[in-house]
Design a protein with these regions (language model features):
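C-terminal partner/receptor-binding element of secreted or periplasmic proteins
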Residues: 67-91
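Mature, folded catalytic cores of secreted/periplasmic enzymes
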Residues: 9-12, 21, 53, 57, ...
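Short, non-transmembrane alpha-helical segments in secretory-pathway proteins
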Residues: 1-26
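Exposed beta-strand-loop-beta-strand "reactive/processing" segments of non-cytosolic proteins
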Residues: 20-64
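Context-gated lysine
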Residues: 8, 13-15, 43, 65-69, ...
């Protein structure tokens, strides 16, 4: 999806993952009302270490379909009750 591709471009440009070739982007449309989500997950197998049967989530990016603003839980200590941050982070 174009949304997942956009997130992938930001993640790679900002070097938010150690091994970009070992990461997948899972697009979940309308995960929340008017919010699309892209889960950034570990890709295992081939040259990537880890159990090929699993794809643990690293973090997620939440995209508002109306405003196209993005937030992520990349910096949240508590994935459930924490506060999402603007994505990409403004340095």
């Amino acid at each position: 999806s174009p949304v997942a591709q956009q997130v992938k471009n930001i993640v790679e440009k900002q070097k938010l993952v150690r091994e970009p070739q070992c990461v997948d982007y899972v697009y979940i449309p309308d995960s929340e009302p008017s919010i699309d989500v892209v889960d950034i997950v570990e890709k295992h197998g081939g040259s990537c270490s880890g159990d090929p049967q699993t794809a643990p989530r690293i973090f997620s990016v939440f995209v508002n379909k109306k405003t196209h603003k993005m937030e992520s839980d990349i910096d949240m200590d508590d994935q459930v009750n924490g506060t999402r941050s603007v994505f990409p982070a403004v340095k």
